[in-house]
């Protein structure tokens, strides 16, 4: 059985955001599978998806500070005509990735107790973000 749906995440400020509930709420009509895989593909080149700490928001703040130091906006980038935050956003997106594959068991994603799905919004004004969710299972 295959199922696919386009999800839209609301616009977020620059930084890392816990979006597990926002994604799962949009997948409420997803067919229930006993065992399967859920693939999430973020359709953007200046944001990222990753799994990380879902409880303490300071982890997200520390992650953002790390990436701002590691890939600064004021770098000497050739690709700069879309703004000072654009090229660093592409780099961060490539470092973290834009897709996740999550196991599904009895209709629920099987993340660890402390794991949540994060959106890394790397633009100052990124806007809404689209995710293609594809479920395969039985």
UniProtKB/Swiss-Prot annotation:
InterPro entries cross-referenced by the UniProt entry: UPF0047_YjbQ-like (IPR001602), YjbQ-like_sf (IPR035917)
One Pfam family it belongs to: UPF0047
Gene3D superfamilies cross-referenced by the UniProt entry: YjbQ-like
Highest taxon above the source species: Bacteria
PROSITE patterns found in the cross-reference section: UPF0047
NCBIfam families, A to Z: TIGR00149_YjbQ
Native source species: Escherichia coli (strain K12)
Name recorded for this polypeptide: UPF0047 protein YjbQ
Family from the record: Belongs to the UPF0047 family.
């Amino acid at each position: 059985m295959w199922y696919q749906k386009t999800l839209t995440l609301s616009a977020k400020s620059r930084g890392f955001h816990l979006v597990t509930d926002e994604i799962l709420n949009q997948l409420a009509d997803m067919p229930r599978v006993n065992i399967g895989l859920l693939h999430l593909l973020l359709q953007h080149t200046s944001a990222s998806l990753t799994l990380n700490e879902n409880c303490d928001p300071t982890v997200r703040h520390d992650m953002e500070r790390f990436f701002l130091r590691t890939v600064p906006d004021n770098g000497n980038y050739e690709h700069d005509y879309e703004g000072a935050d654009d090229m660093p956003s592409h780099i961060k997106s490539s470092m973290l990735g834009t897709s996740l594959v999550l196991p599904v068991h009895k209709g629920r994603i099987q993340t660890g107790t402390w794991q949540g799905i994060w959106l890394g919004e790397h633009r100052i004004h990124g806007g809404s973000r689209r995710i293609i969710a594809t479920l395969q299972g039985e």
